A protein has these predicted regions:
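C-terminal/peripheral segments of proteins
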Residues: 1-133, 139, 143-300
């Protein structure tokens, strides 16, 4: 406000829950002390007011903890990688210009993937295999600069490796459920990063997916899988991030019209820097709803 105070809270209604039941588990609301009984009084809303850091950030991640988090519940908040980068950039300065704040919004560094890059390098170095794709992938990984740049081959490889390992490990957990419910699908799980790393670092044999003898084999086979995918259409070193992350912004009518007309209605397929899990959120058909910098008293 005009006095320099800053605050964060929620807009809209929050349900007032009955009793102390766990809202993340299906429950029978006909039972006492279960379900919602009204709307929460705004006076009980979570509020962050003038934090010691003199900074506020959210980026769709968890903003509160403890009793306040219990009050809100888990609505599927983001991993927090994007919020961490924004926080660190805000704490790096005491004074900001418009350009400084815009640079934070356009930041496409990928520190989340740094240890995935290291893991993939280690996996390739220790592999007892003379496969031809290994030296090619090593060469491509040498260009790693921790950025989701459109021309980065290394970023595309490391990103694909992370998702392949994640898919493989989580599918192992789902397999046990599918033995009893064959159509079971895992929900969207945005907080799996720390769980994955605990498994990778401790390598518990009883949690290893049945198709693999060791965790090292799993990590190697995941690298082998993405190598096979990226070797198509020109080879690994030709498959940069911009080829995958190219704009796909279509006119509402173009999908129902012949291709020669659609090309005049759709936006160009420009290669895009950025990705999920970083401030510059940008994918072929999704991105930040808006990017703006406003100084109080200088709204124009």
């Amino acid at each position: 406000d005009r006095d320099g105070n800053i605050s964060w809270t929620l807009a809209g209604r929050i349900p007032a829950r009955s009793g102390h039941y766990d809202a993340q588990i299906p429950a029978d609301w006909t039972q006492p002390d279960t379900g919602w009984h009204d709307w929460l009084d705004p006076g009980h809303y979570p509020v962050l007011h003038n934090p010691a850091s003199q900074r506020l950030w959210s980026a769709n991640s968890r903003t509160v903890s403890g009793d306040q988090l219990t009050l809100l519940g888990n609505g599927g908040f983001d991993l927090g990688a994007r919020a961490t980068q924004i926080r660190d950039s805000l704490l790096a300065r005491e004074q900001f210009t418009v350009d400084n704040l815009q640079a934070i919004q356009l930041d496409y560094r990928a520190p989340l993937l740094t240890r995935w890059h290291q893991l993939l390098q280690t996996t390739l170095e220790t592999a007892d295999d003379a496969a031809s794709w290994i030296p090619v992938m090593k060469t491509a990984l040498a260009g790693w600069n921790e950025q989701a740049a459109a021309d980065s081959v290394a970023y595309r490889i490391v990103r694909a490796y992370r998702y392949e390992v994640m898919k493989t490990v989580l599918s192992g957990f789902a397999a046990a459920v599918r033995q009893h419910h064959e159509n079971f699908e895992l929900p969207r799980l945005s907080q799996t990063e720390s769980i994955l790393w605990q498994l990778i670092e401790h390598q518990p044999q009883h949690l290893l997916p049945a198709a693999y003898k060791t965790w090292d084999e799993l990590l190697y086979r995941c690298a082998q899988t993405i190598a096979a995918q990226l070797q198509q259409d020109g080879g690994i070193t030709e498959r940069n991030w911009g080829m995958q992350n190219a704009a796909r912004i279509k006119h509402p009518l173009s999908q129902k019209l012949p291709g020669w007309i659609s090309q005049w209605l759709d936006m160009p397929h420009d290669p895009l820097p950025g990705d999920h899990n970083m401030p510059r959120v940008q994918s072929p058909n999704f991105g930040a709803s808006q990017r703006s910098v406003v100084a109080p008293g200088q709204e124009e």
